[in-house]
Amino acid sequence: MKKFVSLFSIVLVLTMLLSACTPAVTPTEETETQVPTAEEIKLVVWDQFYRDVESGVMDTLNTEFEAAHPGVKIERVVKTLDDLKVTLKLALSESTGPDVAQVNQGRSDMGAMVQADLLLPLNDYSTQYKWGDRFSTSVASRNSFTPDGKTFGEGNLYGVSPTAEVVGVYYNKGIFDANGWTIPATFDEFEDLLAKIKAKGITPISFGSLDGWNAIHEFSAVQHILVSLDYINNFVYGVNNATFDTPENQQAAAVMQDWVAKDYFSPDFSGVGYDDSNKLFKTGEGAMTITGSWLAGELIGDTDQQFGFFLLPANPDHT
């Protein structure tokens, strides 16, 4: 069984390996002027940065890391999120699995791997390298479980998030400017804008739900302006009797149904994949799209379109 650590604990692993693998040298006439060379270390790293821009960033970071740590070679394996979820747990149970990998947060992935004793706790490294000064408690909690994997949000630290991301609304600046539209200040203004965009014969929200996972972003963007942060945390961690069956969640679902009925999403969106819908948006098909800040790199290159970003606004009374 092979335990592994998350993406941003690479430095710690390599520090230990380099010190362990450097042979002792007894000075002699021949060796006093020679620098001992550590045995080459291969570090197998799995990540899900498969899109062009972010993949290029990872390649650059890996190259810089290797240059800073002579004798260390990173064998990078790139997978989609779906592939990673399907293959990672089995791979970690074998000696040939990755040394470092990204793990989807939450009970079904990280929690299950903690229960299976596949992940290495990082508490000591967090203390030694003062990660608490760099990462907020809320970010650390999302990567923490009790050793039995049953309690989410407390206990041992099992990973460090490579990014802190938000879900919001990207908009096509050219389309907005050509029609005199501005960023809405309230949710009512946002829905008025959707109607105006539709009336112009433009798809208001570029969206494809074929992959399944990304549909929660459309819902949660609305949900988050209706509920409190305490509710979100209680629900995520499964504490204080938090339930999904609330008036606010029902209201958010009703908004989704209303947008579908009014054709505010891309035509036949249930048959369009996430990446394909983003490509359409990038080429000017659709005035807006609701997704995460991770897409920014893909939108700023290889296109003549200009894009902006804003968080979905709430009404003053959060209704």
Give, region by region, the residue ranges found by the protein language model.
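Conserved N-terminal structural module of periplasmic/extracytoplasmic solute-binding proteins
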Residues: 6, 21-118, 128, 133-134, ...
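Glycine-centered hinge/linker elements that transmit conformational signals in sensory
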Residues: 192-197, 237-269
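Hinge/lid segment of periplasmic solute-binding proteins
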Residues: 107-167, 191, 218-220, 308
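Short, solvent-exposed loop/beta-turn-alpha elements that line the ligand-binding surface or hinge
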Residues: 123-138, 226-251, 301-302, 314-319
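Short helix-initiation/N-cap motifs at beta->coil->alpha
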Residues: 78-87, 187-192, 268-282
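Extracytoplasmic/periplasmic substrate-binding proteins
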Residues: 48, 61-62, 108-112, 217-218, ...
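Short helices/loops that flank or line small-molecule/ion binding pockets
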Residues: 85-96, 116, 175-176, 195-199, ...
